Every structure is written in structure tokens, then in C-alpha cells.
């Protein structure tokens, strides 16, 4: 192409990414060029600085609550947060726990690959599990109110063999999720700053281990809220930057026009203008090759894999069960529904902005760079410079550490209650359990780093692990769901379904890779066809085997033993007993079933169905689409930031008053006095004994008031005589 037409005339933008070489207009070979955007100093500052800050700050918040509110840091408190967490904080925890590195990176990658359908299918395919899990959260309150883990319920209902099978699946899920978090976190820190990937693997968990050791699940929840605030603040910045304020984009019209131009059939995509898998021209598998359509075969296949795979990451991850256990009974269903709806905005709004923004800017990203998750940092850097990269790196660090802390406590709880208390020391005291819980947190924190290094050496990527997880643990989803939902569920069927589903899923996955691509390796097993087949076989076989066995030999269960066998080590909050009444929980179940199914139908069926007639979007339709992304992201961010503060305002004011006055001390003394009066009123002997001790301490031997009275009477008589 002649030097006078560079960049190509059909674009008219992105000139900084084109140059004339030997008289020919050529596009840059990549965006990053293999060089980190930021210095190593910035990387270490984020990983170590933020890690230390949140470790100290979260531990300080936990201490404040203990000092001025009077929280008792028992083993029950460490592992269940007192079972009294309110709606806003539970929703914040769900959002934070479900926001992985993949949520931020992979969602924008599929936007870069498939256009508007990518962010939608990523968000909807991973939201419905949280909405539907709200039903399980209520059922655990109804049928096993004292449970610490889902595996305790398995043992109470199906016995020791089933307990060991599902304990293995739950621990495997936690290990895989942790591996994904550290693989994604270390890879991005390395790509953006040049920090050694192995060093990042060990340094990222460091701060998480410190505050989790100090405060257990409550510290994890507090940290999750703080991390959610940062993630959503950055989210809003990027969304408004792309669609309202950026000088390079700044409006839906500009983004729309440029998306039409970059996918135009008239665009020249010859060798010098499109290399290394760069986005150029019509999109294969999309309607008219456009990025502006939901009619995308690639997007649909990704959506199916995403939906199937993510059921395993929710239903078999003990972290979600712990969040349900920690919630107040009156807050459980609302927290999960709100958390799911707010989380939808993270991948949808962010990828609709940064993912489509990368295309609209015509960034010379290669397929390899996109696979590493570098689409969002590329767009952020192009629009804001290095400050954009710092913002995105901070956002990613928050996502990885927050979800990682939840996995730490989940593993700690499984090892403590399902191994130590069940098989090693059934009579363990609260102090012993607390000691073991903290030891497991420390041990698993170290194991996290070693595991990430091993997987990095083996060449396993975040994307491969993300897609493969459903194949490995998806078979346990339906048996675990039926554990609480079906009174006839059979123990043998549950074990057989979970094990056979996993085995057949892996076999089909590897077979399809071998048949279709001629070899089995990380590359072929990570492609769409083998992953789709393996995920579907795993979850469907697991469910079918369990259902068939349960229908042939039903194992009726009335939930009596689950209440008798699963006990707390220390007493729990008696004030919550009223919320555990059956009629209130049944009402909550009906509420979450109704609204969970409604929103699932809207997100998975109605929304895409209504988008299909639009085919290739018009400017007006795309403007509406962008407006929904902006509004959902903004409203969700406001709710998730302000609601926990509003619900905890009484506690916040009490802590603040305690820090600057003695009011909190007097309030606690009054409370203790009131409790003692209630006890003494119910026990007359205690009242009598108290008065005797009080008189003895106030009047030592020989100075009893009665003796003084006698002396006064004698003196008076002598005077009268």
C-alpha cells in the first residue's frame, strides 16, 4: 500500500499503530512488543504494599469490633463469622468471591474475539449459578442450621464413604480455584510489570494469609468489602471513560462507527496490515461478520461451556456454602440474589467498555497477547497511559486476593471440621479447633504458592484451567444439589454419579481432542469442542446416575440426624433463633425460587431472544446496549458500596464513639449488669449468695453493720438510764 494512504483510508483512525516501511503501510506487530508497561518497582509496590496495607487494616478493623462491640473470637466466630452477616455484606462477599482475574481479563478477551455477545455470555453464564444457589443457602438454614461445611451434611445424611468422596471433590475444587487465581494474578503482574512470575506466585498470598490468620471468615468478609469498593470504583471509571469522557472514543456513536469500520468487508487485511492473529475485517461465525450482533456461533459455544463449567465452581466450592452459613437467616436469600445481579455488571459492563474499546481503537493486539489477558490493560493504557495500567493492576490484585482469602477459609473449615474434628479428635475444644484452623490457613497459604509455581513450570494457563474445571468437578454438582432438595436422594447413586461422571467426562474430553486434532496436549484439550463435550458429559452423567439410583432405590430422609449429628462447639447468637423458624425460612425459599427463576429466565432466555431480531445492531440499538451497561455498572457499584455501610451504621457509630469516648465501655457494663440481674432474678440462691459476699467484702469481720446497730442501741439505753 502506498505511503500516502496510511493508515488505510477505510479506517481514518489509529495512525499511531501504522507506519510506512519500505514504501508500504504496515501495522505494528503487537501492542506491547513483549515489554512490560510498568516497572518492576510498581509491581512490587502493588503486591507488597497493598498486601501489607490490607493485612494491617483488616486486622485493625477486626480488633476494633472485638474491642468496642464485644465480638468473641471463638472457633465458631473464626469459621462462621457468628452466622449473623447482613444482606449488604453477604452480597459484597459474593461479588468479591466471584470476581476472579478471569472475570476481568477473559470477559474482555471474548469481547475482543466475538463482539457484544462475548461479555453478555460471560456475565449471564456465570450469574445464574449464584441466583440459583440462593435456594441452597436457604435449605442449609432449614435442614442443617449448625453446619460449618457442606460435607458435614453429606456425612450426616449419607454416611462416611459418601463423606470422603465429596470431601475429595470439595477440596479439589478449592485447589483448582486457588490455582486459577494465582495463575491469572502472577501472569498479569509479570506481563504488566516484569516481576518474576514465581516471586509473584508466593508474594500475592502473603498479605491474605496474615489477615485471614488474624480474623478468620469475618476478616475475609471485611477485606472482600474493601476490595469490592476498589473494583467497582475502577469499573465505573473505565465505563464512563470509554462511553462519555475519553477524547479518543467518548460516545456510543464513535464506538459504533469504529466497530463497523474495523469489521468492514472492504477493509484491507493483507499480510502487512494483519499479522499474528490481529483483529481485522469480518468476524468468522458472526452475522455479516459484525461485532455488533448476538448471532455469533463462537459466542454461543463459549456461553454453553461457561454455564456448565461454572455450576461446579459454585455448588462444589465450600466457600459459597460458608457464605450461606455465615449469613443471617433473614439475609441469606436477598444477599445471594443481590450479589448475583450486581456481579453481572463486572464482566458485562467492564468488557463492553474495555473489550469493545480495544477493537474501536484498532489496537494491534495479537491473539497471544489476548490469550494472556492483556486486552483490558491495553485499552486502559491506550486511553489513560500508565495510570490506566496501574488502575487495572490494582483492580486485578483486589480480585485475586479477595477470592483467595475465601478459598483459604473454605479449605481451613473443611480440614478442621471434616477431617480433624470428625476423624482425629471428635471431642476437640473450641481452642483446639481455632488452633488447627489457623495452622491450616498458614499451611495452605504456603501450598498455594508452590502449586502456582508447579503449574507455571508445566505450562498450564488460566484459560485452560478455567475451562477444564467443569470436566473435573462438574459431576458432583447435581448430587450435592439433590442432597438438600430431594428427600429420596440415594447415597450410592450420589457417589456413583460423582465418580462415574468425572471419569467419563475426562475420557470423552481426551477422546474428542485425540479424534479431532490427532494428539492430546494442553493446546488441543483446551479447545472449544473437547471442553464442551467433557463439561456436558461430566455434569449430565453425574446427575443421571444419581437420579436413576434414587428412583430405583429411594433413601427417604427426614433431616433429624443432620440436626442431631452436626453441633456447634461454642454457643451461637440466640437472637437469631426467631429467624430460623420454619415458616420464615419457607417464605424465604419461595421468594428466592420465584425471583431466582425469573431473573434466570430474563438473563439466559429473554434477553438474548429479544436481541436476535436486531441481527446487526443499529446505532440506536447499540446506544441502548451501552446505556444498559453504564447504568447497570453504576447502580450496582453504588448499591454494593453503600448498602453494607448503611446496614452496619449502628456498629460503625458504636466503634467511633468507643474510640473517642468511654460510652462503649459504659454500654457494655450496663449490658453485663442487665444480664446478671436477669440471672439472679431467676435464681434466688444466687441473689442471696451475692448479698452475703457483698457484705463480707464491704464490711470485714468485726465491722458488720448489724454489730454497729447493736452497739448504738446499747449506748442509747445507757444514756437514758
From Swiss-Prot:
* Primary role: High-affinity urea-proton symporter involved in the active transport of urea across the plasma membrane into root cells. May play an important role in urea uptake by plant cells at low external urea concentrations.
Gene Ontology MF term list? symporter activity; urea transmembrane transporter activity
Q: Does the keyword Transport apply?
A: yes
- Cellular location of this protein? Cell membrane
State what the entry records as the consequence of deleting this gene: No visible phenotype under normal growth conditions, but when grown with urea as the sole source of nitrogen, plants show reduced growth and slight yellowing of shoots.
Q: Looking at the record's lineage, which domain of life comes first? A: Eukaryota
Q: Which tissues does it occur in? A: Expressed in roots, leaves and shoots.
Q: How does it sit in the membrane?
A: Multi-pass membrane protein
Report what the protein is called.
Urea-proton symporter DUR3
Q: Does the keyword Membrane apply?
A: yes
Please name the gene that encodes this protein: DUR3
* GO CC annotation: plasma membrane
Biological source species: Oryza sativa subsp. japonica (Rice)
Keywords of this entry: Cell membrane, Membrane, Symport, Transmembrane, Transmembrane helix, Transport
Record's family? Belongs to the sodium:solute symporter (SSF) (TC 2.A.21) family.
Which residue ranges run through the membrane?
44-64, 85-105, 120-140, 164-184, 197-217, 221-241, 296-316, 341-361, 393-413, 440-460, 466-486, 492-512, 532-552, 592-612, 625-645
- Which GO biological process categories is it annotated with? urea transmembrane transport
Q: What induces it?
A: By nitrogen deficiency in roots.
Q: Where is this region: Disordered?
A: 699-721
Q: Which CDD domains match?
A: SLC5sbd_DUR3 (cd11476)
Amino acid at each position: 500500500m502506498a505511503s500516502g494512504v496510511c493508515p488505510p483510508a477505510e479506517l481514518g483512525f489509529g495512525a499511531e499503530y501504522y507506519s510506512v516501511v519500505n514504501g508500504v503501510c504496515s501495522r505494528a506487530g503487537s501492542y506491547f512488543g513483549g515489554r512490560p508497561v510498568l516497572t518492576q518497582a510498581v509491581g512490587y509496590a502493588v503486591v507488597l504494599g497493598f498486601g501489607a496495607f490490607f493485612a494491617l487494616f483488616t486486622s485493625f478493623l477486626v480488633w476494633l469490633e472485638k474491642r468496642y462491640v464485644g465480638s468473641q473470637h471463638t472457633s465458631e466466630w473464626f469459621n462462621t463469622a457468628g452466622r449473623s452477616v447482613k444482606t449488604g455484606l453477604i452480597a459484597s462477599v459474593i461479588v468479591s468471591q466471584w470476581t476472579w482475574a478471569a472475570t476481568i481479563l477473559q470477559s474482555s478477551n471474548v469481547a475482543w474475539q466475538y463482539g457484544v455477545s462475548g461479555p453478555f455470555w460471560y456475565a449471564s453464564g456465570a450469574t445464574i449459578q449464584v441466583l440459583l444457589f440462593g435456594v441452597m443457602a436457604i435449605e442449609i438454614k432449614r435442614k442443617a442450621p449448625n453446619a460449618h461445611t457442606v460435607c458435614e451434611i453429606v456425612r450426616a445424611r449419607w454416611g462416611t464413604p459418601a463423606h470422603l468422596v465429596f470431601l475429595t471433590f470439595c477440596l479439589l475444587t478449592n485447589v483448582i480455584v486457588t490455582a486459577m487465581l494465582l495463575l491469572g494474578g502472577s501472569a498479569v503482574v509479570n506481563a504488566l510489570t516484569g516481576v518474576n512470575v514465581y516471586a509473584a506466585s508466593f508474594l500475592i498470598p502473603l498479605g491474605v494469609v496474615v489477615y485471614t490468620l488474624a480474623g478468620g471468615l469475618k476478616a475475609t468478609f471485611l477485606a472482600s468489602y474493601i476490595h469490592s469498593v476498589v473494583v467497582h470504583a475502577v469499573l465505573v471509571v473505565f465505563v464512563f471513560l470509554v462511553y462519555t469522557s475519553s477524547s479518543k472514543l467518548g460516545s456510543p456513536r464513535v464506538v459504533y462507527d469504529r466497530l463497523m469500520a474495523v469489521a468492514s468487508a472492504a477493509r484491507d487485511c493483507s499480510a502487512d496490515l494483519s499479522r499474528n492473529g490481529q483483529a481485522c475485517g469480518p468476524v468468522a461465525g458472526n452475522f455479516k461478520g459484525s461485532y455488533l450482533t448476538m448471532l455469533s456461533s463462537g459466542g454461543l459455544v463459549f456461553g454453553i461451556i461457561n454455564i456448565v463449567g461454572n455450576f461446579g465452581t459454585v455448588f462444589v466450592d465450600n466457600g459459597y456454602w460458608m457464605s450461606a452459613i455465615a449469613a443471617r437467616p433473614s439475609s441469606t436469600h436477598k444477599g445471594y440474589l443481590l450479589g448475583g445481579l450486581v456481579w453481572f455488571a463486572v464482566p458485562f459492563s467492564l468488557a463492553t467498555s474495555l473489550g469493545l474499546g480495544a477493537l474501536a481503537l484498532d489496537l494491534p493486539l495479537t491473539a497471544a497477547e489476548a490469550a494472556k489477558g492483556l486486552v483490558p490493560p491495553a485499552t486502559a493504557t491506550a486511553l489513560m497511559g500508565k495510570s490506566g495500567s496501574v488502575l487495572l493492576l490494582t483492580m486485578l490484585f483486589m480480585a485475586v486476593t479477595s477470592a483467595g482469602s475465601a478459598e483459604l477459609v473454605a479449605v481451613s473449615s473443611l480440614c478442621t471440621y471434616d477431617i480433624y474434628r470428625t476423624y482425629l479428635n471428635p471431642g476437640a475444644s473450641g481452642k483446639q479447633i481455632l488452633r488447627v484452623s489457623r495452622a491450616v490457613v498458614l499451611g495452605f497459604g504456603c501450598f498455594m504458592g508452590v502449586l502456582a509455581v508447579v503449574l507455571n513450570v508445566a505450562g498450564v494457563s488460566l484459560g485452560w484451567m478455567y475451562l477444564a474445571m467443569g470436566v473435573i468437578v462438574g459431576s458432583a454438582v447435581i448430587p450435592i444439589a439433590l442432597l438438600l432438595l430431594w428427600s429420596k436422594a440415594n447415597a450410592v447413586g450420589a457417589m456413583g454419579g460423582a465418580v462415574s461422571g468425572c471419569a467419563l467426562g475426562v475420557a470423552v474430553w481426551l477422546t474428542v481432542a485425540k479424534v479431532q486434532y490427532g494428539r492430546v496436549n494442553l493446546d488441543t484439550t483446551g479447545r472449544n469442542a473437547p471442553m464442551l463435550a467433557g463439561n456436558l458429559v461430566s455434569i449430565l452423567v453425574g446427575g443421571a446416575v444419581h437420579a436413576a439410583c434414587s428412583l430405583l432405590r429411594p433413601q427417604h430422609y427426614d433431616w433429624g440426624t443432620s440436626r442431631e449429628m452436626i453441633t456447634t462447639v461454642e454457643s451461637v447468637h440466640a437472637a437469631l433463633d426467631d429467624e430460623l423458624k420454619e415458616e420464615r425460612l419457607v417464605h424465604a425459599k419461595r421468594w428466592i425460587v420465584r425471583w431466582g427463576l425469573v431473573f434466570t429466565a430474563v438473563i439466559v432466555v429473554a434477553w438474548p431472544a429479544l436481541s436476535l431480531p436486531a441481527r446487526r445492531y443499529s446505532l440506536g440499538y447499540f446506544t441502548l446496549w451501552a446505556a444498559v451497561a453504564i447504568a447497570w455498572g453504576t447502580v450496582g457499584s453504588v448499591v454494593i458500596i453503600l448498602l453494607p455501610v448503611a446496614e452496619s451504621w449502628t456498629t460503625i457509630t458504636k466503634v467511633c464513639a468507643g474510640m473517642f469516648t468511654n460510652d462503649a465501655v459504659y454500654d457494655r457494663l450496663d449490658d453485663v449488669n442487665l444480664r446478671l440481674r436477669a440471672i439472679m432474678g431467676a435464681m434466688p440462691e444466687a441473689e442471696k449468695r451475692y448479698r452475703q459476699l457483698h457484705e463480707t467484702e464491704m464490711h470485714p469481720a468485726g465491722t458488720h453493720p448489724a454489730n454497729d446497730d447493736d452497739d448504738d442501741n446499747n449506748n442509747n439505753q445507757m444514756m437514758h438510764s
